[in-house]
Amino acid sequence: MALCKISSCNIIKRRIMAKKRYPIGIQTFDKIRTEDRLYIDKTEYVYRMTHSDSNYIFLGRPRRFGKSLLVSTLQSYFEGKKELFKGLAIEKLEQDWTEYPVLHFSMAMGKHMEKEQLERYLLYIIGLNEKKFGIENDAVDPNVRLANLIMNVYRRTGKKVVVLIDEYDAPLLDVAHEDDNLKDLRNIMRNFYSPLKDCDPYLRFVFLTGITKFSQLSIFSELNNITNISMNREYSGICGITKEELLTQMSDDIDELAKSLGSTRETAVEELKMNYDGYHFSAQSSDIFNPFSLFNCFANQDFGSYWFASGTPTYLINMMRKFHVLPATLGKMYAKSSAFDAPTENMTAITPLLYQSGYLTIKDYDKTSKLYTLDLPNKEIKVGLFESLLPNYLEGMFAQNGDVTIAQMSVLIRQNDMDGALQLLQTFLGTVPYCNVTNHEGHYQQMLFIIFSLLTGYVVDVEVHTPNGRVDIVLLTDIRLYIIELKLNRDAQTALQQINLKNYAQRFALCGKPIVKIGVNFDSTQGNIEDWIIEEE
């Protein structure tokens, strides 16, 4: 009996030891490899990049997409740590493993700083690299210290220097649209980066990462030889996880997730795709999954909004207000690359910020017209973004509690009980304090658009064109198509009459689903639905 107990303990222990360790929050290549954590092999990209024609490269990707890990991987590679790359693609590609001195600068801690703080921080991170190579320097200007550091390391080692700069734009993101602060901080960063051009004879490779694209003139006015690979097809999969990598390098993880959720492998893959896939970083990019959400999903054995929850996009919501972006306009749009792959500090529309931050992505490309189709990447982004926007239309805590009402509405609509769903919404809105922007019909249209969009799994559109006019809201579910017309301070019968008089239903006659017409009337004094009428076509 004792032997059985010991045997059982050993089995349990082996199972615990065999549990895969995910690199959640770990950005150090050395640590991931020595601790036997999961590493998705990106070393073929490392070899390709470091043996390309350009020695100065910039890569832009959204936050938590693996940029810092890529920088750390480059550092280990250039420092000749061959043992860390055992079993990876680069082990067979690289023959020489030449060791180079590496200067690694992370700007991640340079956020939310005033001018003097930023200058001190730059001197601090330069000092860390000086200490690494036993160099002393008391110059007070960061650009002078950087130039001296590069030249002294070159002389001391007899080898060209590698410079890796992670999150180059971190000090500027929060002030990107504050003209006074941006100008001061931008000048500091421009001066800091300026030695990179004059030090070219001493440099083997320079690599910079960031989220946003600042104009060449504003930051790198002296450095005009940077190659931007952010939209290069060859490097579209350098960060994030491709579908091929998911199905091959994480195949066991998919099976474990499916088993945990009581579903098939195929269903698990579809759920992963719907929630975390959908990113494309070039015209011919393969599907890219969000790595942070994917790892968390496998680690927790459950689907969640991990990436969105890891960083509230306050600055993004503020910029949407500044540019008067309506929720219904977020989604499918057509644009030339100059409209989204563009510097953000002087943007006249919010598209570049949405794209570069990961809230919009490339969905299609027409080679003849060079026209891109952009859209929200996946369910996680759609739900997270609209939940963040809901407080603009509902007050404080009531917006936060709205998710329960919305979930209940979703159940009722699936059961073909739109009347019950609208009753539930009316009751909920009755608990929301009066909002002083409720005297415009468009306010209610946007509010309903957000709420219907959060039902998930349904297609929602506003201002849909028909031969006789525009429909306020169209909601397409698995079993019905709803035509919804809104009125303010009038009556639901008037709204329904407009649907019938203008024969809106004819526009959707070939949709293959029963059509339901709904007239809804809001009362601006109550900020709530006053009445509605539902009629089958």
Functional labels for PLM-detected ranges:
Residues 448, 471-488, 502:
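Conserved catalytic cores of phosphodiester-cleaving nucleases, focusing on short active-site segments
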